[in-house]
C-alpha cells in the first residue's frame, strides 16, 4: 500500500511540474503573439523550445504552430489528442484512482474528461508501475489466502503429540 501511495504522490508531483510548464508555455505564447510571427526574438523562441523539451520528458504530445508562431500542444502522438495549450488557453492535468487503476484527467474551461492519450514519458511509466503494483498485490493476496487454506487443512487433518486433532493455524476470515 505504501508503494502505491508513494507512486501516486510522485505522479501528482510530476503533474504539478507538467502544469507549471504549460503555464510557462502560455506566458511565452503571450509574448510571441504580442510580437507577431516576424518579430519574435530568438530568445523567446528558444525558451519555448526548451519548455517543450522539458515537457516531453513527462508526457507525449504533438505541437502545431499558430499564425503568430505560438505553440498549440495536443496530448498523444496522433495530432488529434486533447488540447493542452492553445494560445494562452491552457488545460490542467490531474490524476485519480478508479477501480484500483490510476487515471489521468484533463480540465479545460471547467470541463473535466478522462484522458488516455498519454502513452509515453515519466507519467506513463509511473501509471503503469502503479497499475502493476496493484495487480501483483492482488496476486500475492490470493497466494497467501490459498497457502493459509492449505496449511489449515493439513493442520486440521493431523494429530498432535497428545492425540488431539489439529486446529487451524491461520485465521483467514480477514483475508
Show the residue positions of the predicted features.
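Phosphate-proximal small/polar/acidic motifs at interfaces that engage nucleotide phosphates
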Residues: 31-175
